[in-house]
């Protein structure tokens, strides 16, 4: 199996590109300019930016000029923007606390815009599970509107490769999983220019919703299983942080934060009753040899380890280590979506057969999987756009989950990605993750283990 191949849409489509309208795109060093915009530039035959909305018309027009968007129209009215007939897809990339109002207004004002087919929103869908549920409910009333959520970690070539190895039985049945991560600026220091909402528990952006949220979504995706029950302990042991100057040096100035800086999480996966233990803390490792992210997956016939330099799996250029059973169909083509060469160091293990597994020497293999020159910040998001293009120009994928039957597709919409290799995460995938994160906070507050087997839609 090779799911790390290029998009099926390898040639320029005969019909016009998907016309994209952006909410929040500005020039400079903004997140959307460094990610979504660069991704679309690489897929110019499939996507074309035709509209921009920003709070002021001046900002929209300046961005159009600076980014040389010759086909784009600027807007300062969200209502007019949502009703613009020349838009096929709207991409929302603003601060998470603004998602609810922006997305709700788009859904309401675009109700008569039959040309609008796609609504793509950055994670998190909203600042709270209640807001997210409402947005999902409204979107479900739009029969011809396809939703997309930016859980781009699922598209990481390392995550896809790990999912392949597990689904092909290369490590046997999973016995246990351990995760440890460091969530960047949630420790003792933070940059002076870092936005304050990132440290406000009410904003919906924090160590748990962001670092843990993306990671646990990827874990469920890799293993093909949601959680059955979970238990969590949350701490804010660093309520005051030192500010760093523009050179990264600590100043004497301090500032308060209300979001957590530590999470202890335990859970049991539904499939195989696999125990999962997870620890996330704020800050970077004290020891330089300690990785910011480590995921260890232990099986009856082998092991997987995923390591990253940042505690954000969705934007980290990872390394995948594999020891287990060689599957003839599981080899990768050795290239990423941009044709970059892959480092795949393989070694036959000279080891006696294991008495516990009965594995012979010839069947065992080791692999280190890493992609040279792969930019995970842009590349993972680009792969979501490729999946959207495949869906738009070639039709919805028909494959099933790699682990058992999955929900049937709706007649016209891609309902949810679930655990499929193909497709893209939707608002339904977002709601499932929002509910799990909400359960994590409730478990800590109620000081008990919670049954989360009913959170799926």
UniProtKB/Swiss-Prot annotation:
GO terms for molecular function: DNA binding; nucleotide binding. Residues 333-364 are annotated as: Disordered. It holds the Pfam family Gal80p_C-like. It comes from the Eukaryota. One of its GO terms (biological process) is galactose metabolic process. Keywords: Carbohydrate metabolism, DNA-binding, Galactose metabolism, Repressor, Transcription, Transcription regulation. Disulfide bonds: none annotated. SUPFAM superfamilies: Glyceraldehyde-3-phosphate dehydrogenase-like, C-terminal domain (SSF55347), NAD(P)-binding Rossmann-fold domains (SSF51735). To yeast GAL80. This protein is a negative regulator for the gene expression of the lactose/galactose metabolic genes. It seems to block activation by the transcriptional activator LAC9 in the absence of an inducing sugar. This is Galactose/lactose metabolism regulatory protein GAL80. The gene is GAL80.
